């Protein structure tokens, strides 16, 4: 590959990084809008998280299905990999439902940082599956990331010890509601770990649109089933809610496209751009809900991002020619689990 010269336009030289960065801006925006409709910020009705997921993934499924049909790709994927695709979808359902429930009770930045733990858990699980020794660097990264999450979630004793400031308006003042958010987030992380681990095993043997379709269809089926047994899971009645949900769905489709296009590059800087979603979440918390971003929140976010990014960069620099495929696959597919992520994906998730 020819080395870029000084005359190379900035966009051409950094196209992949800019695409992934744009995808994370889209992801943060759609998550912020999802929280707006879930908590009813400035609206006259609240929309249940399952309804948000149902409409968002329905639009994504339509887009992916149209692409697969035009490209003449089998909707179900390779026969031998369908059990793994189903496992990825099942994990994704728990991951997305947990994340979207958590943003009803936690701030956007809290839920996002918590969701980013899933990739580290996936590395641990795939290491166990493959019978490999767990690297010391990964162990340190996991411990550091958990410490960062504690700083972001700020248990009451720690928070009071640092400052007696008023609790942010974006965080529920009800301790039980906050606990629900944390439990939902942890459930999402568990689902994300399963989803990312399955994607690690799938590798590049499956078209990304097929993987997304499995996940999207599963979400639509599950949320539709819940709508029949949970009276609160209903479609919105106001036009502004529908407009926001449509924007969420379109942003989700745009995010998937930008992420897939950007991750075609082997440059490790591209993957690092995924972690910028934490910064956008912090900014949107302040811009929309005027949340008080304290030192612990910023420090915890930086610790989590560093614990994810540093081990990856270390591997890339230590083994430039080695195929670090199993690790890259999980990191590359983080926005598909959150939502995701991480999800996500999430995401992380």
From Swiss-Prot:
Subcellular location, record wording: Membrane
The protein's name: Probable transporter vicT
Main location: membrane
Cited function: Probable transporter; part of the gene cluster that mediates the biosynthesis of the secondary metabolite victorin, the molecular basis for Victoria blight of oats.
Lineage summary: Eukaryota, Fungi, Dikarya, Ascomycota, Pezizomycotina
Annotated keywords: Membrane, Transmembrane, Transmembrane helix, Transport, Virulence
Family the UniProt entry places it in: Belongs to the TPT transporter family. SLC35D subfamily.
Record membrane topology: Multi-pass membrane protein
One GO cellular component, as annotated: membrane
Residues that span the membrane, as ranges: 49-69, 89-109, 111-131, 133-153, 179-199, 215-235, 244-264, 269-289, 294-314
Residue ranges constituting the EamA domain according to the UniProt record: 25-153
InterPro entries, A to Z: EamA_dom
Species of the source: Bipolaris victoriae (strain FI3) (Victoria blight of oats agent)
């Amino acid at each position: 590959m020819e080395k870029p010269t000084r005359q190379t336009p900035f966009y051409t030289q950094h196209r992949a990084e800019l695409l992934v960065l744009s995808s994370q801006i889209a992801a943060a925006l759609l998550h912020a809008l999802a929280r707006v409709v879930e908590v009813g910020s400035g609206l006259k009705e609240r929309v249940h998280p399952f309804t948000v997921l149902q409409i968002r993934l329905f639009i994504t499924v339509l887009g992916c299905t149209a692409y697969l049909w035009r490209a003449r790709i089998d909707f179900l994927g390779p026969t031998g990999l369908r059990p793994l695709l189903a496992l990825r979808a099942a994990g994704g359902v728990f991951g997305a439902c947990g994340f979207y429930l958590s943003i009803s009770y936690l701030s956007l930045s809290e839920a996002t940082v918590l969701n980013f733990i899933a990739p580290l858990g996936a590395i641990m699980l795939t290491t166990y599956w493959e019978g490999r020794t767990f690297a010391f660097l990964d162990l340190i990264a996991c411990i550091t990331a958990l410490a960062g999450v504690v700083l972001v979630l700020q248990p009451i004793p720690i928070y009071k010890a640092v400052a007696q400031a008023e609790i942010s308006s974006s965080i529920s003042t009800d301790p039980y509601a906050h606990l629900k958010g944390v439990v939902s987030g942890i459930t999402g992380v568990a689902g994300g770990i399963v989803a990312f681990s399955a994607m690690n095993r799938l590798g590049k043997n499956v078209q990304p649109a097929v993987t997304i379709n499995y996940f999207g269809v599963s979400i639509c089926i599950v949320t539709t089933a819940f709508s029949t047994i949970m009276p609160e899971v209903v479609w919105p009645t106001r036009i502004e809610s529908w407009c926001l949900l449509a924007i969420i769905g379109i942003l989700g489709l745009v995010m998937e496209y930008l992420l897939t296009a950007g991750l075609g590059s082997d440059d490790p800087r591209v993957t690092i751009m995924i972690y910028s979603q934490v910064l956008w979440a912090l900014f949107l918390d302040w811009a929309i809900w005027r949340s008080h971003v304290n030192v612990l929140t910023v420090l915890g976010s930086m610790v989590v991002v560093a614990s994810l990014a540093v081990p990856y960069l270390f591997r890339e620099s230590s083994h430039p020619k080695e195929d670090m495929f199993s690790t890259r696959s999980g990191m590359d597919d983080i926005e598909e689990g959150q939502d995701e992520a991480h999800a996500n994906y999430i995401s992380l998730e």
